[in-house]
């Protein structure tokens, strides 16, 4: 199809197709010139039908809740609190739920550990943090959420446009309408909260039913979490983190970030000491709680791999 004609077709369809009210959210996405260009690109690069895709974008609008949620209030340094953060996640609901989840899915967890080298406790902890073992997978329409962030949130527009592209491909591959899929305000999907690109690249059919279903299959979720970590460099049997004592000024080490760069032995020259392999690379992590002494840990490669899953 001629590109100029394709662009014109998108424009005509965007203006003529009906769409639901929601006037507080602005015009339908199909009326946005950037969205029209995106639709043309999806047609040219992946063979999507322009009219069909335009109808889908005509039924969604910028979601102001999503746009507010992606802009969390900045937390001043003096308000950081490891204790508050810890209490938020280490609740009796998560602990009891984790124990029950582990018992119910022990076979799959052991199989994932044998296949990918990731221990059950790490997989269980991640799923507990992400969705409380599938109880809170998000209620946002993923197409609307990703479109809102792709075209209404300039700081990360490139990232979310890429995820929107991956999401449409994912929906087509699975034979489902992109309008039917629910997830987080950032477009993460299912029990393990995979972004669309991660689902296409790392998710696995771990229950052997010839389909990957991260919303309904705990087995697929378990295997996919383990494979994600393995593919990002998980080292079987290696430590994640150990407590550290600090006698010097740790500012430079903290500022260096969480990717392991110095050996434990090299850390000692900065007044950082821990019981660990002297040659193992580490990063210094500070856990700050106002009014109490800062807690320090050395994070190793496996800790960094976990942050690749979710930095928060």
Language model segments and positions:
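Functionally critical loop-and-helix segments that line ligand-binding/catalytic clefts
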Residues: 193
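Cell-wall glycan-active module
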Residues: 1-4, 8-161, 166-182, 187, ...
């Amino acid at each position: 199809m001629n590109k100029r004609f394709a662009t014109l077709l998108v424009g005509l369809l965007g203006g003529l197709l009906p769409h639901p009210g929601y006037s507080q959210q602005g015009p339908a996405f199909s009326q946005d010139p950037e969205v029209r260009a995106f639709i043309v690109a999806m047609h040219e690069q992946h063979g999507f039908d322009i009219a069909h895709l335009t109808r889908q974008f005509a039924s969604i609008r910028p979601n102001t809740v999503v746009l507010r949620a992606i802009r969390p209030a900045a937390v001043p340094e003096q308000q950081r609190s490891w204790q508050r953060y810890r209490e938020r996640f280490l609740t009796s609901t998560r602990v009891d739920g984790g124990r029950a989840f582990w018992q119910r899915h022990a076979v799959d967890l052991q199989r994932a550990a044998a296949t990918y080298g990731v221990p059950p406790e790490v997989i269980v902890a991640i799923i507990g943090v992400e969705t409380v073992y599938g109880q809170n997978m998000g209620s946002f329409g993923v197409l609307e959420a990703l479109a809102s962030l792709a075209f209404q949130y300039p700081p990360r527009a490139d990232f979310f446009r890429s995820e929107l592209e991956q999401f449409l491909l994912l929906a087509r591959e699975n034979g489902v309408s992109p309008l039917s899929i629910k997830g987080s305000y950032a477009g993460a999907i299912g029990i393990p909260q995979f972004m669309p690109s991660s689902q296409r690249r790392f998710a696995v059919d771990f229950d052997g039913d010839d389909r990957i279903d991260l919303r309904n299959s705990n087995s697929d979720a378990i295997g996919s979490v383990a494979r994600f970590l393995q593919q990002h460099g998980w080292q079987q049997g290696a430590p994640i983190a150990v407590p550290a004592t600090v006698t010097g000024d740790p500012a430079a080490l903290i500022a260096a970030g969480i990717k392991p760069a110095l050996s434990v032995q090299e850390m000692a020259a900065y007044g950082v000491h821990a019981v660990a392999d002297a040659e193992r690379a580490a990063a210094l992590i500070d856990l700050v709680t106002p009014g109490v002494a800062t807690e320090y840990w050395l994070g190793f490669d496996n800790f960094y791999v976990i942050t690749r899953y979710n930095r928060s």
